[in-house]
Design a protein with these regions (language model features):
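Scaffold/interface architecture of coatomer-like assemblies
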Residues: 64-348
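Low-complexity, intrinsically disordered or signal/transmembrane-proximal segments
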Residues: 10, 22, 31-33
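Bacterial N-terminal signal peptides
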Residues: 47-60
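Ser/Thr/Pro/Gly-rich low-complexity, intrinsically disordered segments
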Residues: 1, 7-10, 19
Length: 348
């Protein structure tokens, strides 16, 4: 806050009110009074005292001029990574800022940042389910995972590797060296339960400290059996840390009786809510699924806006992205459902 003095502030012998000094963060001024040899008549001194008290009261009651106070406020830029495809799944490129419309909690927002095929650094965690139902396919997961890592990582990107069964175990911390991920993939080991939601929760927190895009790629047949973390808790952590989830659902080859349909649905909705995507994998199809994840990450639009006209008291702000001119073209637009804010973000 900046306090400026105008007009009366320059008067010699001005009286500083307690209120003005407190607002500006300044100590009261004390002026040295010179003793005059010839004392004023008692009536003159009384008149001066009354005038001084009146002036002090006037200054104390006088509101500070608006132009004399400056407030500075930080406003958060909300970043949305958006994928657009047609009804056949083909990627739609060549769109411009003017093609998109963004709203938050039903209130229109102005797009301040726009980029095609964002070159922001990519921070990705590969999380592999090694519970008993999928551990038998670990050789396929290891080989396909290595090819995915070597094809995806660029000089500015980083990747980490975790496995989850009865518990979550980090095999490789964030690195830009594919060989380190390879060595981690060679150390996969099995377990009994499936701590799926624990893996999402912990991976989201780890990714939350990174700049750029944050992506969690899950390879699982679906279904959390550890029951330490709930679906809602896992999803909230992903949204709080702006993590996009890509679910690669490795369903059993056997009949549908061996499938966890509820768990598969959870993987699908986690991807939808965070702006990612889900893929079903048939026998030997992991390479194709990884390739589609890589393509999806390389064909994103980045939209950014500074929130305005927010509804007070909201913790979660829901966003909506549309392409008005595409109303009749059945475009599929994917982006995260919204974002959490510990306190309302003020607009300008």
């Amino acid at each position: 806050m900046v306090c400026r003095l105008r007009g009366i502030a320059h008067l010699k012998g001005m009286l500083w009110s307690t209120r003005f000094a407190q607002v500006c963060g300044l100590p009261p001024l004390r002026q040295k009074q010179k003793r005059r040899k010839d004392r004023a008549p008692r009536t003159l001194r009384a008149t001066a005292a009354i005038f001084a008290l009146s002036l002090g009261a006037l200054l104390a009651a006088r509101p500070l001029p608006a132009q004399g106070v400056t407030f500075r406020m930080d406003v958060k830029l909300v970043s949305l990574f958006v994928n657009v495809t047609d009804q056949n799944g083909a990627i739609i490129g060549g769109l411009t800022r003017d093609d998109f419309s963004v709203s938050e909690d039903g209130r229109p927002q102005q797009i301040a940042v726009f980029e095609r095929q964002s070159e922001l650094p990519l921070n990705l965690t590969l999380a592999i389910d090694t519970s008993g139902s999928v551990y038998k396919d670990r050789a396929l997961e290891q080989d396909a995972g290595k090819r995915f890592v070597h094809a995806l990582l660029r000089p500015r990107d980083q990747m980490s590797l975790i496995e989850f069964a009865t518990e979550v175990r980090q095999l490789t911390p964030f690195t830009n060296k594919p060989a380190q991920i390879d060595r981690g993939l060679d150390r996969l080991r099995g377990g009994d339960a499936t701590a799926l939601y624990d893996a999402i929760y912990q991976a989201s927190q780890s990714l939350g400290g990174k700049d750029g895009r944050k992506v969690l790629v899950l390879v699982s047949d679906g279904g959390d059996t550890a029951e330490n973390t709930t679906y809602a808790q896992a999803l909230e952590q992903a949204l709080r840390h702006e993590v996009m989830i890509y679910s690669i659902i490795d369903v059993p080859i056997e009949a549908s009786a061996g499938r966890d349909i509820g768990g598969e649905h959870a993987l699908i909705t986690l991807a939808e809510q965070t702006g990612g995507k889900s893929f079903y994998v048939s026998d030997g199809g992991l390479d194709k699924a990884f390739a589609r994840v890589s393509e999806d990450l390389r064909t994103q639009y980045l939209l950014g806006y500074y929130p305005k006209n927010q509804e007070p008291g909201r913790t979660f702000h829901r966003v909506r992205v549309t392409i008005p001119r595409a109303a009749q073209q059945s475009f599929n637009i994917r982006y995260r459902a919204g974002y959490y804010a510990d306190a309302p973000v003020k607009g300008n």
